[in-house]
Amino acid sequence: SGKYNNKFMPDDARFAAYFKNTNPRIQAQAKRFVNDKTIDATKAYQELAKEHGISPVTLAVAYSKHFDFIASTIIGARSASQLEESFAAFDFNIDNELMRKIEKIQGDILYPMG
């Protein structure tokens, strides 16, 4: 949705509350998922989505539904527009060229879990 494009996120963002939490474990988890590496990856995925005329949310949901071994894709939305972006993924298919670009980003900027 663009909320986490840099380290200055809106006060109502979920991770903003995690960073302000006094529990060191919660802060550590927040830093694991919102850091320079993940912000760089987010920017790369946003640019890729823009190149294909879709929102980053649509790209993420389309990526999840692309794999037949994923039984279901769980989405979350705070607004009707976010829900519409998720639903747009049902009309969007990831072709081989786009998948190669996604995999390049994944190779260049590794997922924070591994």
Predicted regions and their residues:
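Glycine-rich, positively charged active-site loop/lid region within alpha/beta enzyme cores that binds
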Residues: S1-E47
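Generic surface-pattern signal
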Residues: M9, K20, K31, K50, ...
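Conserved short secondary-structure transition element at the edge of the structured enzyme core
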Residues: Q27-D91
